Amino acid sequence: MAWKCPECGNWNTFEEVAVETKKTSYLADDFTNSVHPQNLTDVESVKLSRLSTGNEEFDRVLGGSGGIMGIVPGSVTLLSGDPGVGKSTLLLQIALALCQNGKKILYVSGEESESQVKLRAERLFSGTKGHNNLFIFSTTNIDKAVEEAKGYDLVIADSIQTMVSANFPGFPGSIPQIRYATSRLVNLAKKKKVPVFLVGHVTKEGIVAGPMILSHMVDTVLFLEGEKVTGVRILRSFKNRFGDTSEVGIFLMDENGLCPIQNASEFFSAKSDQKLPGGVYYSCYGRDAPASG
């Protein structure tokens, strides 16, 4: 078949050129080192260590045993909750607390600029000690974020729905983008043995936005919920590969951030009017956390 070029007007001047398409896998790297199957008796036993955040309520929800609770190295934790409930505030507090202990933290923000994150950090912690261990990277490019996340003791991605890569079509928050971004961070955590926290949005129904595979890919799923009237916040665990899911953490939101409430029964009893005629106290048991009311 003869073809005429619309530019020069000549016939049969077209040349067929094969264009190589770049194929990118959702699983960017294989973080495993296994070459062949091993017998269970030959597998080396590794004692599970944990990194304490200094926040007893938060550490207890993450789990542990023998008095050692906190973050498992190489674990990936998804923290979700309603908008404005305090997800970013809680993780920034954890990051600042770890910085005080000499840990190097990377906070990747896809929703705020570096200066906005600094304003929140100064409100939560007025001191200067340890601030040089906290690094802020404002970007929505997941590939850049992973490339920069080297040599840190903890990585926070806020939020996973804002992360995007040029390797995949779709807008931020779409299924291919969320799946790819999560797989990059999971590989980072497993290969470098660095814990990663992801902030996740929720839908109007109160479930994590995005594909259900997001919850399956991570090790721990935490949900932070709050009351509309009071500043009480409750942290629950709905999935935990390294601990129990029955624990809850109770916090109070004030101008200094989220303050742990260690004695929930005493706190809620003190808030009630003890002189109210006909007032009745009762005990309840929810998700293995006893309290009185």
Regions found by a protein language model. Give the residues of each.
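Cys/His-rich short segments
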Residues: 1-24
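The Walker A/P-loop phosphate-binding site
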Residues: 26-127, 143-147
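P-loop NTPase motor core
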Residues: 72, 77-78, 89-90, 137-232
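Conserved P-loop NTPase/AAA+ ATPase motor core
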Residues: 75, 248-249, 255-293
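Residues at the starts of beta-strands that form the adenosine-phosphate
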Residues: 103-105, 133, 195
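Conserved AAA+ ATPase core "coupling" helix
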Residues: 120-121, 219, 226-239, 246-249, ...
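A short helix-to-beta-strand connector/capping loop
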Residues: 126-135
